[in-house]
Amino acid sequence: RVQNNTMDINVNEIQSNLIEAARSWDDKLEQALSASFGEAEGNRLKNKYRQAFPRGYTEDVIPGSAVADIEQLEALSDDNRLGMLFYRAQEQGQDSNRVRLKLYHRAEPIHLSDVLPMLENLGLRVIGETPYEIDCGSETFWILDFSMLHPRGPLELDASQKRFQQAFAQIWNNQLEN
């Protein structure tokens, strides 16, 4: 109950919140692409990825993270068919032993049975995997998002991210034994 009806109401803040709530995921992605890549490149990417993301992806991934995924997908080529990002989710604290790995691939999916032994041999326990098929019409990409535990406690991600990604890539490309 409000005493004497003296509560201050910020009408501009309420309007701003309503406008933000009414914006679609695609609208937010378009804005994030323009902010990250500039208007011309943002428009090109918006047109390419406009209908590409499946519903599960748009429900699971915020538009700002989708921009990072698009950047990884755009870096793929015939010579560079695998991209990756080893990271800790924002909702996990630095002292968490949970880590994630996103694999990005062109044309065909990566099979769980190919990746699981590699991750386990690198000392991680896979507790979940979510695949996303990104269909841009003229080309198809795959994103596999792995959720994992490091059984010996938290990883110092800043120190281990680059080494992990290099080791995984070398194993994937048969330059190191699994």
Regions found by a protein language model. Give the residues of each.
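Non-catalytic interaction/regulatory segments
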Residues: 1-178
